[in-house]
Amino acid sequence: MVSAPPLSPPLPSRRVRLAARLARALLWLVLGFWLLIGLSWGLLHGWIVPRISDFRPSLEAQASRALGVPVRIGEIRVRSLGLIPSFELREVSLLDRDGHTALRLPSVVAALSPRSAWRLGFEQLVIEGAELDIRRRADGQLEIAGLRLSPVDDRERSAFADWTLAQTELVLRGGTLRWTDELRGTPPLALTDVQAVLRNPGQRHLMRLDATPPPAWGERFSLRAMLKKPLLATGHLPWQDWSGELYAEFSRADVSLLRQYLPTDQSGVVVSSGQGALRAWADVRNGAVTGGTADVLLQGVNTRLGQDLPPLVLKTVAGRFGGRQLGSAYELRTEGLSFAADDGLDWPVGNVLLLHTPADGNKPAQTELTADRLDLG
């Protein structure tokens, strides 16, 4: 009896062969990635860290190109040799066009990782004890310690702003901030014990600032922002394309002083006086505030809800206020509003909706007011 020849195993299909090649390619990519990480760590800890002082001229040149102004570093010291080493840059100076020191930073602690080294940046920058003088000139240009933050030409972008927003994390501790607004002509404002952090993960920008204002202003306050930029930016200023939310919290503040430094309110609402607690949220779209909400608990309020409306004097006011721009018109609303006025008007708890449309050609201005639970007795 003749036995049949053994059957040969079936050949793998084309799809299986393609999957095998793809798996091998992915494996080599993973191995190459980890090899690159290992080489980066070795280069960072074996070459850069031991010779960090020798890199001072290179760091000065790189910082000068990134910021667009001459940078001088007095001394570099190694502070930590952990997985992410950190260095202290002492007596960092940013020079103006005449070669004079425009901004002096006594201590800057920089953390360097392989990822940040590849993109010529830092994993974290901590600036301690800095005194920042921020000024908006009469032509609208922004300056920090005499260094221009806004570009000279509308067709250009600010190297200083772009570099700042490219850092993974930027921290300011124990600083002093002085704000001068020549465009609006408001008195200079000095903030002390400033603690600020800026994080830039991906397309997002997360900011927080805590500071102590002058005694007449009130108590320590907090400002926060959660903003996102588009994949393709078109504005000559980085933040012109951002959208997101702003938040402010004041445990005690003088509203009449606070409003001098806020963006101009196109709705015609003016608060001449008022003190108390305030929390506010603002919606931002393409770099402009489009609406907002505020929770308030105020005393001694003197306000005007519109240019054509009489002033309103209130002993106390509490509740939530909101508003938004509707083309040339604007809408104001309240939730859970209660107040007591000097003229005896008492509103226990209620809601208000006000819609104001300004005059347009032959059409007169119109104001619609809707309210519930109004007690005029």
Residue ranges and their predicted role:
Residues G121-E123, A166-T168, H205, Q240-G244, ...:
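Outer-envelope beta-barrel architecture signal
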Residues V2-V16, V69-P70, S86, E91-L198, ...:
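Secondary-structure transition motifs
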Residues V2-L67, L132:
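N-terminal type II signal-anchor transmembrane helix
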Residues I76, R90-L94, A130-L132, R173-T180, ...:
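Generic short beta-strand segments
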Residues G185-L206, D210-A216, R224-L231, L237-W239, ...:
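Beta-propeller and related beta-repeat scaffolds in trafficking/envelope systems
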